[in-house]
Regions:
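N-terminal auxiliary segments of SAM/dcSAM-dependent transferases
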Residues: 1-19
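Conserved class I S-adenosyl-L-methionine
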Residues: 60-67
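Conserved SAM-binding loop of SAM-dependent methyltransferases across substrates and taxa
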Residues: 70-81
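Conserved SAM-binding motif I beta-strand of class I
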Residues: 84-89
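Conserved SAM-binding strand-loop segment of SAM-dependent methyltransferases
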Residues: 106-120
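A short acidic, Gly/Pro-enriched loop at the edge of an enzyme's catalytic core
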Residues: 119-131
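A short glycine-rich, Lys/Arg-flanked "PGG" loop and its adjoining helix->strand segment in the class I
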Residues: 144-159
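Substrate-binding/catalytic lobe of Class I Rossmann-like enzymes that use SAM or dcSAM, i.e.
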Residues: 166, 172-268, 274-277
Length: 277
């Protein structure tokens, strides 16, 4: 699928690049700042605990993370809660990194990964207690198919957690979808990305048969997360540029565009759904 191959232009870059500006867990999505003194590292751990709480995890559950990145969520849930985790990513380099980290943490038997596209992979029906998509649906062409697939692999009573950046509303999407900044992020950074209004994601979830249990506005948290990333990019610019001249400036430009839109054109939400039947 073209969208999967295109997103690899960003996510399959050398993992060391992301290690220069992300937290030690290399979590590449919004953190959660519970206090003014929270660092990026502590805020990302806060966020992982928040996800576990929203999912109602108690330990030992079967969890599927779609768009698992460098494994921050599955490694955390395996290490802290003993969950049996599966991560999906189209970027081969991420899988090698996760395997190394799982072995180093002593949780290799609880962590597996699959290279490919969620809608196309062979996954067990009702095989998971929880499914997570953190910043993943933006890279998937058909959200209706994503939610239908998530319902298929969740057990009855299982929980789906989705966090995603969204246009504020349909009118904003119409006005800004073709702007230069939107095109730069979509094409020059990710290769494929499609911001949608929250209403479209909720409709897709409900049409798939999910019950919505909560919606959280995490926009301010993502604004602060990206500000911390920008500071780290600036501090590590020379090391980042060692992987390609001008790469640090390109990353900074992308992050600045993202932060300029919060509350004006874009929001970031956490949506929790239950597979009630």
């Amino acid at each position: 699928m073209t969208a999967v191959a295109d997103t690899n232009q960003h996510y399959d870059l050398d993992p060391d690049i992301f290690g220069q500006f992300l937290d030690p867990l290399r979590k590449y999505s919004a953190a959660r700042y519970d206090a003014e003194h929270d660092t990026l590292e502590s805020a990302q751990r806060n966020k992982l605990r928040f996800v576990a709480d929203r999912l109602g995890l108690r330990g030992g559950e079967r969890l599927l993370d779609v768009g698992c990145g460098w494994g921050s969520l599955i490694l955390y849930m395996a290490s802290e809660l003993g969950c049996r985790t599966t991560g999906i990513s189209p970027a081969p380099r991420q899988h090698g990194y996760i395997a190394e980290q799982a072995a180093a943490r002593g949780v290799a038997e609880l962590v597996e990964t699959k290279v490919g596209h969620f809608e196309r992979l062979d996954l067990p029906a009702r095989g998971f207690d929880a499914v997570t998509l953190l910043g993943s649906i933006v890279h998937m062409p058909d959200p209706d198919e994503v939610f239908r697939r998530a319902k298929t692999v969740l057990r009855r009573g299982g929980t789906l957690y989705v966090s995603e950046s969204c246009f504020r509303n349909t009118a904003t999407r119409t006005a800004f979808d073709d702007r230069d900044g939107t095109g730069f992020v979509r094409e020059d950074i990710f290769g494929f990305g499609e911001l949608r209004p929250l209403s479209e994601l909720i409709a897709a979830a409900e049409n798939a048969g999910f019950s919505i249990t909560s919606v959280d506005d995490l926009t301010d948290d993502y604004r602060r997360t990206i500000a911390d990333w920008i500071a780290n990019v600036d501090a590590a610019a020379a090391r980042i540029d060692a992987h390609g001249p001008g790469l640090a400036a390109k990353l900074r430009h992308y992050l600045e565009i993202a932060n300029a839109g919060w509350g004006y054109t874009t929001k970031h939400y956490a949506l929790v759904c239950r597979n009630a039947r």
